[in-house]
Amino acid sequence: MVVGQRERKRRCIRGEPLMNDTTWVLDGGRLIDPANGIDRIARLVLHEGKVHSIDTPDGDVPPDAGRLDVTGKIVAPGLVDLATELREPGSEEDETIQTGSNAALAGGYTTVLCCSSTKPLMDSAASVQLVRQIAQRVDGVRVLPIACLSKGRQAEQMAELGILAAAGAAGFSDTPRPMPNDALLKRALDYCRMFDLPIFDRPEVPELADGGVMHDGQIGLILGLKGLPTEAEDLAVARDVRLAEATKGRLHVGPVSTMGSIDMIGRVKSRGIHISASVCPHNLFGSDELLRSYDSRYKVHPPMRSPSHVEALRNAVAEGVIDAIESGHMPRAQEKKANDLDLAPFGASALETTLAAIATDLVETKILPWSRAIECLSTAPARIAGVKGGTLSVGANADVTVIDPLNAWSVEAKEFRSRCHSSPMTGRTLTARVTHTLVGGRLKFELHPTVASAAS
């Protein structure tokens, strides 16, 4: 049964589902499903949590079905994020699974892979199960834990990967830390082939990056801030691609931010080596020039690089060298970010702005068509992670994102659903906004003219 506007607002405040209809009809929208090569005006019918049909005649639609008029909007598979920090348990001052889920839904995400930035770390079956249990209680976005690759995230001993996989881990990583132990990474890549689960590596050589604040370039020299050299990333990527080639394991490298990384990844892909890579939105729009303000909201990781790197990254996304775009959501409490640039932590809130930033910086500028943008934000991440999603195929989970491509809005971080209100996008006018997010056929987010609402 469809509920009224006042009841929707009440449910939003209480964190309850907005709608419970078992059947939804989305009429008049531009259906974009890169997995099936679909990009046309079509009717989409969802039933009992699954994609039921496309272009169903009126006579075959139940009369009591919930209906959404999405004329002029884009209907896409729900977005999938490869690396989201939700910070719970242990750092709830930064983010909780509830607030992070609300932010994800408002950004069009239906599935997020949750990094092990928790306390306790996700290096035991109990800690993985705890995150899954909290996420189930929240009942918002789908949360898939990425367990630690090494015990205690110390890069000394391999974690008990088999036990973690059995507990529900969707993959393994020491993110946000890199993996400096070459031998451990090689063993893990070999071992994970038994589970067919991916390993995610954040490429960086710690000894070269230690103490760095921003891109190691002319701007950093002028500002007197220690740099994060491109070589720190390039050398790690070189190691990663060689190990991926040697082991044939499932290795994802990202986020990347340098021309050197792109060059190496492109060359190994041309030889048929299976490796995937991702990039963050902040590396596709802003350069290190923004750090002249000494504003800690621009202290993100990977750091904003010089304009030549930004241009190369954009081209790499367009050409398919970079497979996916991840949000880079690393929430940190305002009292932590409100510090001198060299003392403030890396991090930013990004789930609510990623799609709009890509639409503004890559689609509006004709670098990407909408189909490629959706592929990078949904289809490719689902494929890389090996999870259900990223498609509107009949029988697939009814995870759907509806986008108004012409909705221009000003980013005000204080209005974020995330607990973190630090964002490099603050003050920008972005084009395109999510209007509806459905997870498993349930309407979890709806943007109203007078109130923006996210439901669990």
Swiss-Prot record:
<dbReference type="GO" id="GO:0044205">
    <property type="term" value="P:'de novo' UMP biosynthetic process"/>
</dbReference>
<dbReference type="InterPro" id="IPR050138">
    <property type="entry name" value="DHOase/Allantoinase_Hydrolase"/>
</dbReference>
<dbReference type="InterPro" id="IPR011059">
    <property type="entry name" value="Metal-dep_hydrolase_composite"/>
</dbReference>
<comment type="function">
    <text>Catalyzes the reversible cyclization of carbamoyl aspartate to dihydroorotate.</text>
</comment>
<dbReference type="GO" id="GO:0005737">
    <property type="term" value="C:cytoplasm"/>
</dbReference>
<keyword id="KW-0378">Hydrolase</keyword>
<protein>
    <recommendedName>
        <fullName>Putative dihydroorotase</fullName>
        <ecNumber>3.5.2.3</ecNumber>
    </recommendedName>
</protein>
<dbReference type="GO" id="GO:0006145">
    <property type="term" value="P:purine nucleobase catabolic process"/>
</dbReference>
<dbReference type="InterPro" id="IPR032466">
    <property type="entry name" value="Metal_Hydrolase"/>
</dbReference>
<dbReference type="InterPro" id="IPR006680">
    <property type="entry name" value="Amidohydro-rel"/>
</dbReference>
<comment type="pathway">
    <text>Pyrimidine metabolism; UMP biosynthesis via de novo pathway; (S)-dihydroorotate from bicarbonate: step 3/3.</text>
</comment>
<comment type="similarity">
    <text>Belongs to the metallo-dependent hydrolases superfamily. DHOase family. Class I DHOase subfamily.</text>
</comment>
<dbReference type="Pfam" id="PF01979">
    <property type="entry name" value="Amidohydro_1"/>
</dbReference>
<dbReference type="InterPro" id="IPR004722">
    <property type="entry name" value="DHOase"/>
</dbReference>
<dbReference type="GO" id="GO:0004038">
    <property type="term" value="F:allantoinase activity"/>
</dbReference>
<dbReference type="GO" id="GO:0004151">
    <property type="term" value="F:dihydroorotase activity"/>
</dbReference>
<keyword id="KW-0665">Pyrimidine biosynthesis</keyword>
<dbReference type="GO" id="GO:0046872">
    <property type="term" value="F:metal ion binding"/>
</dbReference>
